[in-house]
Amino acid sequence: NSAAIFNFSYERYDWVRPGIMLYGISPFADKNGVDLELQPVMHVVSRLISVKQLRQGESVGYGATWQCPEDMQVGILSLGYGDGYPRLAASGTPFLVRGQRCALIGRVSMDMIAIDLRRCPDAGVGEAVTVWGQDLPVEEIARHVGTIAYELVCNMPLRAPYIWQE
């Protein structure tokens, strides 16, 4: 397996089964793939479908579990648990907008996620948002969700459009 490849010498063997490292993902709980000089093979991107200015105290998401600590801009992503994003991801789980970390706020719904855009006040509808990939390791998202990266990459359904590149 991938962990064994990193931890043991294989000069005397004819074959190995690399597993998760083929995705560019670390097999170790305390490391990301880039720490091991692996390149992620999956870059998941969504887009902002709405940007709203909310007032301090307004609630976001099902069950009103998150309230705006101040007047702020909130973005809505076209992404949810129906697209393979983990429903149990908590507020604070990171996304990247223009290279800036923006936190998930409220609950993940089937088709949408709300994010805090205070770090990217100029972000607008159509803006690309990195869910995970080169600059936001899937291992980090998995740690926020309390799962493993393998589960996240294997749960991406065909409902989400795939763009294959070499």
Swiss-Prot record:
This is Alanine racemase. It catalyses: L-alanine = D-alanine. Its cofactor is pyridoxal 5'-phosphate. The active site is at Y62 (proton acceptor). GO terms for molecular function: alanine racemase activity; pyridoxal phosphate binding. It comes from Piscirickettsia salmonis. InterPro entries: Ala_racemase, Ala_racemase/Decarboxylase_C, Ala_racemase_C, Ala_racemase_N, PLP-binding_barrel. The keyword Isomerase applies. Pathway: Amino-acid biosynthesis; D-alanine biosynthesis; D-alanine from L-alanine: step 1/1. Its EC number is 5.1.1.1. Keywords: Isomerase, Pyridoxal phosphate. Substrate binds at M110.
